[in-house]
Amino acid sequence: MMAGGNVRFLVLILAVAICGAASVFQPISDSHRSAALDVFVPVDGSYKSLEEAYEALKTLEILGIDKKSDLSSKTCENVVKVLQSSSSTLKDAFYALNVNGILKCKIGEAGPKDIVSQLQAGVKDAKLLLDFYYSVRGLVLAKEQFPGTHISLGDAEAIFRSIKSLSQSDGRWRYSSNNPESSTFAAGLAYETLAGVISLAPSEFDPSLIQSVKTGILKLSDSIQKYDDGTFYFDEKSVDASQGPISTTASVIRGLTSFAASESTGLNLPGDKIVGLAKFFLGVGIPGDAKDFFNQIDALACLEDNKFSVPLILSLPSTVISLTKKEPLKVKVSTVLGSKAPALSVKLTQALSSKSVDSSVINNQELKFDADSATYFLDSFPKNFDIGKYTFVFKIVLDESAHEKVYITEAQTKVPIAATGAISIENAEIAVLDSDIGSVESQKKLDLTKDGAVSLSANHLQKLRLSFQLTTPLGNAFKPHQAFFKLKHESQVEHIFLVKTSGKKSELVLDFLGLVEKLYYLSGKYEIQLTIGDASMENSLLSNIGHIELDLPERPEKATRPPLQSTEPYSRYGPKAEISHIFRIPEKLPAKQLSLVFLGVIVLPFIGFLIGLTRLGVNIKSFPSSTGSAISALLFHCGIGAVLLLYVLFWLKLDLFTTLKALSLLGVFLLFVGHRTLSQLASASNKLKSA
């Protein structure tokens, strides 16, 4: 029997390798919705801050997940508290209004007026870009949520110019006038802020101001980064290392879409960059970080609802086509959030083989449409379509010309495709040859689709030859990614050899005379195993062919010995043996009684010192009598006692570094109080002498 489990594992690994290399972009799907519930998890019915609450609620709202009822109670309490407090920061007020726009919290009548007044004061006093951003965008939110409140910026052009003064010549912006460094992330905030100023202005703006901003946007777009697959993104340079490509690109997209939403701006961006930015966020996959998750979904929502053009994404449920199962090619077209696309047609303009990129196997083939599954498919392939790697080139054509102003697609979408099938294995044989004349001594036909029981014998003067032919379903030569021949000695020593392929024939010749050292001069029975695998090969195999008895010369004394083999092949993955450390045997210690006597001899002088003090008496006449001097002297003696206590602790339990740290602090303390005490004693002595 063939080792089916190993073969299935081999095929799985190869399939994953191909799929992982494919540059295929998928729209937002149920996997994102499932992941969002794991990423945005509230604690006790709320989030740590209103900023986190807004990002979670906004993401879940875009994905169509209703969690408002679970979060509205505690979160609304925080919103009302912030909006009714005069001491709330502009940032807190901004995020409170964002959350309120989703949860529709019940705010008192005085709340809107108070928060509007606070935000208007924030606009007037703002010097930093973030202060302008929070206050202006907060007023825009307040205008949307409180229709009865009149909100406008009387000096809108002056505010616009103040914000514009923070711009740089390369299209990036500064956070403040005192900071010369510019930021791409700040540019996105600035465009959002300027869009808010335009929407709150009581009259039309000076066109030259808007044109100057549009010029800066064009310069900023020149700094956009690009991958080979047509993906575009913005990245921060140096001013704010905490902002990565995801947050920076999301900030710019929010700013551009907000600025373009104003009718007076007339802003437009090239379609290829819109699609490239969408592909960047779709290529991220599912972020594990909550901030990145929010930026991804929010940026895609901005691209899906913008004044430029809505990008359409072509995706494939699978990039592997089985010719054996006659599977059709399936293609889907949708918006970035997975919404239904308008009426259109999909053409397969080219199918380029990796073996011949100059000629196309398929040309201008229009795919059929299945309305029930909203899938475009190609259910038949030309006769010359063989297994292998291809690059399919698709083109999307909108049915109605009016949709061309609303939607945008790539001019060409290139997708790597792997066509798989069953490989024919023919003329498989194994033979023992004489080394001198190359004549066949024994030869066996093989059926590699199943295990065999071939029995061969050879000596060190002979050769072993294995040969077979691999052909595709169309009869073309096939060269597998992996073709290994293994000899396994009865002592479990293994040797692996690579089978080379030339044309249609794969062959391996082992000259045992040149392999005796590699085989460690081990005579005896060797099991023969052949492994053939390829990502395009559906019938990859691991076949046990049989065995061969080898008669090799005796091993010389200086020859390399075979490595020790475990009786259990999988024991290498089990627990390792415990490592036992052998320490140096401690030196012999003196008797306990002798140690105690020695300790007594050391302590004896100290005892004598104490006895002498009791006999002579302690002279404390010079101890300061005034309160300040007495405290300094007392602290000095306490510090000396603390040092002595530290020595004892060092002897008993503390390490050297901890002791030195404590001693340095005590030393500074003793230096201060000791100097003060000595100064006071010297002053008192001088007074006595002068008297």
UniProtKB/Swiss-Prot annotation:
Among Pfam families, the record links this protein to: Ribophorin_II (PF05817), Ribophorin_II_2nd (PF23861), Ribophorin_II_3rd (PF23860), Ribophorin_II_C (PF25147)
Signal peptide positions are 1-21
Q: Please verify whether the record's keywords include Signal.
A: yes
Lumenal topological intervals:
22-593, 652-653
Question: Transmembrane ranges?
Answer: 594-614, 631-651, 654-674
**UniProt keyword Endoplasmic reticulum present:** yes
Query: Which GO CC annotations does the UniProt entry carry?
Result: cytosol; endoplasmic reticulum; Golgi apparatus; mitochondrion; oligosaccharyltransferase complex; plant-type cell wall; plant-type vacuole; plasmodesma
Could you describe the subunit structure of this protein?
Answer: Component of the oligosaccharyltransferase (OST) complex.
Q: Which family does it belong to?
A: Belongs to the SWP1 family.
Protein name listed in UniProt: Dolichyl-diphosphooligosaccharide--protein glycosyltransferase subunit 2
Organism expressing this protein natively: Arabidopsis thaliana (Mouse-ear cress)
Lineage of source species = Eukaryota, Viridiplantae, Streptophyta, Embryophyta, Tracheophyta
Q: Which gene encodes it?
A: RPN2
